[in-house]
């Protein structure tokens, strides 16, 4: 059995930054550190940080006065931000800068009185945070997930209308929704640069290349990870058997026993140690040395807040 690895895969710059913010805050201030929502959608990462003293909460009211609070990489609404400001809390923002970019687009539209349409998945924390940037009562903010949603949508003023997208969507699906928006609302204005982030786009491109060669594709990522789900869906659309797994223990030998080639990738919130464990598991089932495919080089780095820019080893 051949083992192929997608490239790129795993952690993106936004996830790296968010985890570093929590780790550095724990090192500097000590436990407990409160984090609103899972800092990233990965069970291994969240469990590891929880063991070190991070407490994951959903409501600001759960945080005691005087505590350290961190917003997750998915971002928060203005209402949540204002609630935190009203409390005696030290707040650090781990929102991915590429999510913040979309927040700024929504806030700008709100100030101008333009109505805005967000392409995204209902209930996802990034969507809730992005929708929560719009505050103009004279306008409106709408959520669509599919072309069908677009055709049933009614807005107040088609002449002052813009759209944005969640950063972790399927590139292909989003293109279909944008096409529908432009047909339904010919004057609609989109972002100058695509809101789907570089990491999402690159990982979907990489899984396409992987699925062209592999019989079975394993995507390392948690069930609540939007970008990981999109990778598994893409491989399945290409006619491959694909499984979304949290870790190597999820793999069943029956999945791969007849496969000549198994492809492995990982969502943007999945650490490389999980991929290495998957490789080891596949080798138990007769897999050979893992071969990494050629792919796009990623060298983007997002800095942590200056208050947390320390060598963690100095405070251990």
Swiss-Prot record:
Listed GO MF terms: 4 iron, 4 sulfur cluster binding; 4-hydroxy-3-methylbut-2-enyl diphosphate reductase activity; metal ion binding
Q: Cite the binding residues for [4Fe-4S] cluster.
A: 12, 96, 197
Q: Which sites bind dimethylallyl diphosphate? A: 41, 74, 124, 225-227, 269
UniProt keyword Cytoplasm present: no
Return the protein name.
4-hydroxy-3-methylbut-2-enyl diphosphate reductase
Q: Describe the task this protein carries out.
A: Catalyzes the conversion of 1-hydroxy-2-methyl-2-(E)-butenyl 4-diphosphate (HMBPP) into a mixture of isopentenyl diphosphate (IPP) and dimethylallyl diphosphate (DMAPP). Acts in the terminal step of the DOXP/MEP pathway for isoprenoid precursor biosynthesis.
Pfam families (UniProt xref): LYTB
Keyword annotations from UniProtKB, A to Z: 4Fe-4S, Iron, Iron-sulfur, Isoprene biosynthesis, Metal-binding, Oxidoreductase
Q: Which organism is it from?
A: Salmonella schwarzengrund (strain CVM19633)
So, what pathway does this thing act in? Isoprenoid biosynthesis; dimethylallyl diphosphate biosynthesis; dimethylallyl diphosphate from (2E)-4-hydroxy-3-methylbutenyl diphosphate: step 1/1; Isoprenoid biosynthesis; isopentenyl diphosphate biosynthesis via DXP pathway; isopentenyl diphosphate from 1-deoxy-D-xylulose 5-phosphate: step 6/6
What taxonomic lineage is listed for the species of origin?
Bacteria, Pseudomonadati, Pseudomonadota, Gammaproteobacteria, Enterobacterales
The record lists its disulfide bonds as: none
Q: Which GO terms describe its biological process?
A: dimethylallyl diphosphate biosynthetic process; isopentenyl diphosphate biosynthetic process, methylerythritol 4-phosphate pathway; terpenoid biosynthetic process
Catalytic activity, per the record?
A: isopentenyl diphosphate + 2 oxidized [2Fe-2S]-[ferredoxin] + H2O = (2E)-4-hydroxy-3-methylbut-2-enyl diphosphate + 2 reduced [2Fe-2S]-[ferredoxin] + 2 H(+); dimethylallyl diphosphate + 2 oxidized [2Fe-2S]-[ferredoxin] + H2O = (2E)-4-hydroxy-3-methylbut-2-enyl diphosphate + 2 reduced [2Fe-2S]-[ferredoxin] + 2 H(+)
User: How does it associate, per the subunit comment?
Assistant: Homodimer.
Q: Which EC main class describes this enzyme?
A: oxidoreductase
In which family does this protein belong, per the annotation? Answer: Belongs to the IspH family.
- Presence of the UniProt keyword Iron in the record: yes
- Gene3D superfamilies given in the database record: 3.40.50.11270, 4-hydroxy-3-methylbut-2-enyl diphosphate reductase, catalytic domain
Q: Which residues cross the membrane?
A: none
User: Any note on cofactor binding?
Assistant: Binds 1 [4Fe-4S] cluster per subunit.
Listed binding positions for (2E)-4-hydroxy-3-methylbut-2-enyl diphosphate are 41, 74, 124, 167, 225-227, 269
Q: Which residues participate in isopentenyl diphosphate binding?
A: 41, 74, 124, 225-227, 269
């Amino acid at each position: 059995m051949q083992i192929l690895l997608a490239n790129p895969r795993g952690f993106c710059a936004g996830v790296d930054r968010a985890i570093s913010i929590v780790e550095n805050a724990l090192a500097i201030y000590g436990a407990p550190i409160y984090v609103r929502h899972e800092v990233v959608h990965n069970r291994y990462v969240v469990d590891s940080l929880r063991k070190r003293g991070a407490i994951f909460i959903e409501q600001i009211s759960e945080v005691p006065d005087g505590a350290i609070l961190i917003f997750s990489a998915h971002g928060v609404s203005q209402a949540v931000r204002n609630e935190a400001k009203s409390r005696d809390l030290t707040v650090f923002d781990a929102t991915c800068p590429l999510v913040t970019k979309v927040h700024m687009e929504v806030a700008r539209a709100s100030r101008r009185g333009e109505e805005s349409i967000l392409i995204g998945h209902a209930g996802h924390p990034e969507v809730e945070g992005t929708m929560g940037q719009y505050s103009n009562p004279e306008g409106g903010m709408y959520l669509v997930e599919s072309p069908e949603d677009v055709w049933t949508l009614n807005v107040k003023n088609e002449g002052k209308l813009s759209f944005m997208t969640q950063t972790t969507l399927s590139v292909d699906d989003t293109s279909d929704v944008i096409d529908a928006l432009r047909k339904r609302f010919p004057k609609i204005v989109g972002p100058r640069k695509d809101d789907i982030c570089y990491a999402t786009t690159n990982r979907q491109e990489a899984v396409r290349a992987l699925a062209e060669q592999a019989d079975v594709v394993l995507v390392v990522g948690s069930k609540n990870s939007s970008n990981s789900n999109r990778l598994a869906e893409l491989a399945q659309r290409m006619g491959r058997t694909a499984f979304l797994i949290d870790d190597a223990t999820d793999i069943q030998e029956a999945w791969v026993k007849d496969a000549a080639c198994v492809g492995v990738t990982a969502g943007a919130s999945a650490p490389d140690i999980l991929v290495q464990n998957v490789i080891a598991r596949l080798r138990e089932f007769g897999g050979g040395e893992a071969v990494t495919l050629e792919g796009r080089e990623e060298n983007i780095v997002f800095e942590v807040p200056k208050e947390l820019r320390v060598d963690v080893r100095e405070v251990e």
